[in-house]
């Protein structure tokens, strides 16, 4: 996969200036589609027949086996497509295919939370070629999706505002093309790590941009430059809301060795894909998990990821934080501006959802050198222990830290404190936490107190005060 992304950028053939197709209109190789710095080769997309865009419909009635549908009244009427439901198209990227497990898995998670028409768009006929050619073929894919959306509107009175197009990699730009052709009337487009090569820095006409739908949200997971870092995704903001989980460049869990990747539980193919492009693929895995974790991917507005990791962007502002992924459209300020940036951390494996807390500990007892940890207990669950501070522990001093729990503990009922000495201390000092304040990302605070002190490695339970 890696050589195809890089070397195929250098391959291509000189084509004619324009080609036209009855249903989809004309396609040119003039600027900005070709002949610009980011895409110097003059290449036309392949024909609709060669790209062979297919629409694979899953619904709540057929969650496991798709029905292939077309922009045809009898095809739609003879399927499980329901006009009183939202329709979510999912478009894969380079070398991928519409029958790949991840697309169906998105649909299956959707069926857990809503009744929906879930259409996986297969264009493997145009994706399994050199990258430069595939980057042109997405124009055909976008045109086919736009034609399908317009057909639903004309034949069934189905509003484009009820359409959501989700695209990964090159599929994100295909979604943008569909949106451009429908004049921005599509309700929502979600770009899952939109492809960088041939798109970063190009005019809006070529790539995904906020004007392509009423609402455009983007997840960036592989934003390092393609040269020399082989980052496949864009770092450029291209939506109303742009999320940069873990900074948007290196995703946790993506540095496993090749053997552990290939013998992954997902199988040899999925494991090999993960090794070749793990960061790039994380975007659709985050989206899949977000569907069943409606509050587990809060994105914080922040100047940069470095500022975020310095604990300077918590809690959420008065307008709240958007949720990265499926529920981003619930954010009240989603279209207040374009290029709004948000940062968050995720887990290193599914379930990727995390819940961020700020914990402030006021110490009591003796002055010692060591480190302190706190665990949270709530009405929804309990967290593991997280380190709050390491260094000199002084009575009446307060130390704060933020951490991302893999459990949403809900309303807190108690906290537990423990400390460890960094050196052997024969005096057996005792340290306690006179007060611990826990703050959630929405600014809700819980206060806990204890008059006790404990020796190292002994748990101290604090109750509400």
Swiss-Prot record:
Stated role: Plays an important role in fat metabolism. It preferentially splits the esters of long-chain fatty acids at positions 1 and 3, producing mainly 2-monoacylglycerol and free fatty acids, and shows considerably higher activity against insoluble emulsified substrates than against soluble ones.
Annotated organism of origin: Homo sapiens (Human)
Protein name: Pancreatic triacylglycerol lipase
Family per similarity comment: Belongs to the AB hydrolase superfamily. Lipase family.
Position of the signal peptide: 1-16
This protein's record includes keyword Lipid metabolism: yes
Lineage: Eukaryota, Metazoa, Chordata, Craniata, Vertebrata
Domain of life, source organism: Eukaryota
Binding site for Ca(2+): 204, 207, 209, 212
Field pH dependence: Optimum pH is 7.
